[in-house]
UniProtKB/Swiss-Prot annotation:
<dbReference type="InterPro" id="IPR037143">
    <property type="entry name" value="4-PPantetheinyl_Trfase_dom_sf"/>
</dbReference>
<comment type="similarity">
    <text>Belongs to the P-Pant transferase superfamily. AcpS family.</text>
</comment>
<keyword id="KW-0276">Fatty acid metabolism</keyword>
<keyword id="KW-0963">Cytoplasm</keyword>
<dbReference type="InterPro" id="IPR002582">
    <property type="entry name" value="ACPS"/>
</dbReference>
<keyword id="KW-0275">Fatty acid biosynthesis</keyword>
<dbReference type="InterPro" id="IPR004568">
    <property type="entry name" value="Ppantetheine-prot_Trfase_dom"/>
</dbReference>
<feature type="binding site">
    <location>
        <position position="61"/>
    </location>
    <ligand>
        <name>Mg(2+)</name>
    </ligand>
</feature>
<feature type="binding site">
    <location>
        <position position="8"/>
    </location>
    <ligand>
        <name>Mg(2+)</name>
    </ligand>
</feature>
<dbReference type="Pfam" id="PF01648">
    <property type="entry name" value="ACPS"/>
</dbReference>
<keyword id="KW-0460">Magnesium</keyword>
<dbReference type="GO" id="GO:0000287">
    <property type="term" value="F:magnesium ion binding"/>
</dbReference>
<dbReference type="GO" id="GO:0005737">
    <property type="term" value="C:cytoplasm"/>
</dbReference>
<keyword id="KW-0444">Lipid biosynthesis</keyword>
<keyword id="KW-0479">Metal-binding</keyword>
<dbReference type="GO" id="GO:0006633">
    <property type="term" value="P:fatty acid biosynthetic process"/>
</dbReference>
<protein>
    <recommendedName>
        <fullName>Holo-[acyl-carrier-protein] synthase</fullName>
        <ecNumber>2.7.8.7</ecNumber>
    </recommendedName>
</protein>
Amino acid sequence: MILGIGSDLIDIRRVGKVIERHGDRFLDRVFTDAERAKAARRAKSEKMVVATYAKRFAAKEACAKALGTGIRDGVWWRDMGVVNLPGGRPTMALTGGAKARLDAMTPPGYEARIDLSITDDWPLAQAFVVISAVSSAKA
């Protein structure tokens, strides 16, 4: 059963301007160490790095919407991180307030599954998150 859906669309250039203005202060506040490492590995061009951050920013916004909280009520940017499963499929890893909210919205006898789609086509980045509950026996 679907517990929450969220989407976000962001202008990559806007993220680039925030990074130029605030640098590491912004990156440290919003992105996990794993997300920053992923962006560093894409350092072939500045455009790729900024697009990588923009997609992850959109994913966090979409996830916060799917959680039903937005970035408030104890859910913070670094509580949500984009990670890839062994087969490469992206998903969200939640900690802190985001994990607590996910646990609270998941019915007993079920486990939460977070499906994430992220994409970019300059100058836009988009993310779509679906949070579902799957039977613990099937998980």
